[in-house]
C-alpha cells in the first residue's frame, strides 16, 4: 500500500496531517484509565463516536491525512494496564473508526496507520529484536486492511525505525 501511495502525486505537494488525537480526546472529555490514554476510548465502545467525531473535526479543519487512534494500543502498554486481551479488538477498531470518519466526511483523505514505538515512549527500545519484530508485525497486520500507508510515530532510535521498516516493507 505504501508503494501504491508513493506512485501517485499525493506527496508532491504539501499535505496536512491531523492533530494530536490523544490530547484532543482528553480536551473533549475522555477519561483515561491508567496509562492507556487514547486507547481508553477504543476499549470503551461508548467513546467510539467521540473518536469518529474527532477524526471528522480534523478532516473538516483541512487534514489531508488522518492517523489511526492506536498509539497507546501497543502490547506493552496494554499489559501494564492489565487489558492485553483487547489488543486485537482495539487495533482493528482504530482502523474501522478512521474509515468510518473518512466515509462520513465524503472527502478524499488518506488514512495513515500509526505504528508507535513498541515499548516506552521517547526512549529507545533495547529489548531483543525478535520481540520488537513480533510486536510490530502483529500490530501492523491488524491495521493494514484499513489504511493507505503506515506512519511511524515518535520513534526514539534508528534501530526501531529499521525494524519497523523491515516488517512493513
Regions found by a protein language model. Name each.
Residues 2-169:
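Domain-level signal for soluble alpha/beta catalytic cores
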Amino acid at each position: 500500500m505504501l508503494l501504491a501511495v508513493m506512485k501517485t502525486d499525493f506527496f508532491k505537494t504539501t499535505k496536512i496531517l491531523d492533530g494530536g488525537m490523544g490530547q484532543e480526546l482528553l480536551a473533549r472529555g475522555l477519561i483515561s484509565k491508567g496509562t492507556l490514554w487514547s486507547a481508553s476510548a477504543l476499549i470503551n465502545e461508548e467513546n467510539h463516536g467521540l473518536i469518529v467525531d474527532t477524526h471528522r473535526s480534523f478532516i473538516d479543519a483541512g487534514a489531508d491525512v488522518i492517523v489511526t487512534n492506536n498509539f497507546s494500543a501497543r502490547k506493552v502498554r496494554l499489559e501494564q494496564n492489565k487489558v492485553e486481551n483487547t489488543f486485537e479488538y482495539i487495533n482493528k477498531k482504530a482502523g474501522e473508526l478512521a474509515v468510518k470518519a473518512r466515509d462520513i466526511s465524503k472527502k478524499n483523505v488518506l488514512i495513515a496507520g500509526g505504528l508507535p514505538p513498541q515499548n516506552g515512549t521517547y526512549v529507545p527500545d533495547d529489548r531483543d529484536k525478535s520481540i520488537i519484530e513480533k510486536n510490530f508485525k502483529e500490530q501492523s497486520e491488524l491495521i493494514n486492511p484499513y489504511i493507505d500507508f503506515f506512519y511511524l510515530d515518535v520513534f526514539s532510535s534508528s534501530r526501531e525505525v529499521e525494524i519497523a521498516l523491515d516488517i512493513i516493507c
